[in-house]
Amino acid sequence: MLALRCGPRLLGLLSGPRSAPLLLSATRTCSDGGARGANSSSGNPLVYLDVGADGQPLGRVVLELKADVVPKTAENFRALCTGEKGFGYKGSTFHRVIPAFMCQAGDFTNHNGTGGRSIYGSRFPDENFTLKHVGPGVLSMANAGPNTNGSQFFICTIKTDWLDGKHVVFGHVKEGMDVVKKIESFGSKSGKTSKKIVITDCGQLS
């Protein structure tokens, strides 16, 4: 069971095969959207997630992946967006959304927080903790403890510096933070969403 500590409360979040604990300790092709190798001005890949809620489109989130800092983690996410390995994020859900904290997704096998896999196998090690959870829009890996990264990820909606050194930050929202806020609006303190929030399409931008 994935344990997410919010202040004195412990919120259960399921992640990983065998319901391994995904620890978010808190104190308070998918289709290809264009040519391969699309980059931001920094030379890092840009990917997109098109998101809908109960069948209604919410919009597009564009993410810059920090391949210059965490290349292996960034490549995992990029390939899961394009679906080039035969599996990926398209059709999966934001299964856990906690307002004033984060929006979690990436379980494309079980769709409830108990599954997912990386392009390197079931799990891969923490690459580094160079990047920090500095504020809204930070893109970070969910995990079940040290060196258990798979496909689940979360987008922060506040600064979450208590997660530094525990979760690998590998990107940030470049465009579409308004869409992230819409996703957040369907969340709850327990993490259960009031609508089914689906990644309807995803890929790499040209």
Curated annotation (Swiss-Prot):
Binds cyclosporin A (CsA). Is displaced by CsA from the mPTP leading to a lower open probability of the mPTP. The modification N6-acetyllysine is found at residues 66, 166. One of its GO terms (biological process) is cellular response to arsenic-containing substance. One of its GO terms (molecular function) is peptidyl-prolyl cis-trans isomerase activity. Coiled coil: none annotated. GO terms for cellular component: mitochondrial matrix; mitochondrial permeability transition pore complex; mitochondrion. Disruption phenotype: Mice are developmentally normal and show no apparent anomalies. Mitochondria do not undergo cyclosporin A-sensitive mitochondrial permeability transtition. Cells show resistance to necrotic cell death induced by reactive oxygen species and Ca(2+) overload, and animals show a high level of resistance to ischaemia/reperfusion-induced cardiac injury. Mice show a dramatic reduction in brain infarct size after acute middle cerebral artery occlusion and reperfusion. Its EC number is 5.2.1.8. Residues 1-29 form a transit peptide. It comes from the Eukaryota. It catalyses: [protein]-peptidylproline (omega=180) = [protein]-peptidylproline (omega=0). Acetylated at Lys-166; deacetylated at Lys-166 by SIRT3. Transmembrane segments: none annotated. The modification N6-succinyllysine is found at residues 66, 85, 174, 189. InterPro entries: Cyclophilin-like_dom_sf, Cyclophilin-type_PPIase_CS, Cyclophilin-type_PPIase_dom. Residues 48-204 form the PPIase cyclophilin-type domain. Associates with the mitochondrial membrane ATP synthase F(1)F(0) ATP synthase; the association is increased by inorganic phosphate (Pi) and decreased by cyclosporin A (CsA). Interacts with ATP5F1B; ATP5PD and ATP5PO. Interacts with SLC25A3; the interaction is impaired by CsA. Interacts with BCL2; the interaction is impaired by CsA. Interacts with TP53; the association implicates preferentially tetrameric TP53, is induced by oxidative stress and is impaired by CsA. Interacts with C1QBP. Interacts with MCUR1. PANTHER family: PEPTIDYL-PROLYL CIS-TRANS ISOMERASE, PEPTIDYL-PROLYL CIS-TRANS ISOMERASE F, MITOCHONDRIAL. Belongs to the cyclophilin-type PPIase family. PPIase that catalyzes the cis-trans isomerization of proline imidic peptide bonds in oligopeptides and may therefore assist protein folding. Involved in regulation of the mitochondrial permeability transition pore (mPTP). It is proposed that its association with the mPTP is masking a binding site for inhibiting inorganic phosphate (Pi) and promotes the open probability of the mPTP leading to apoptosis or necrosis; the requirement of the PPIase activity for this function is debated. In cooperation with mitochondrial p53/TP53 is involved in activating oxidative stress-induced necrosis. This is Peptidyl-prolyl cis-trans isomerase F, mitochondrial. It comes from Mus musculus (Mouse). The lineage of its organism: Eukaryota, Metazoa, Chordata, Craniata, Vertebrata. The gene is Ppif.
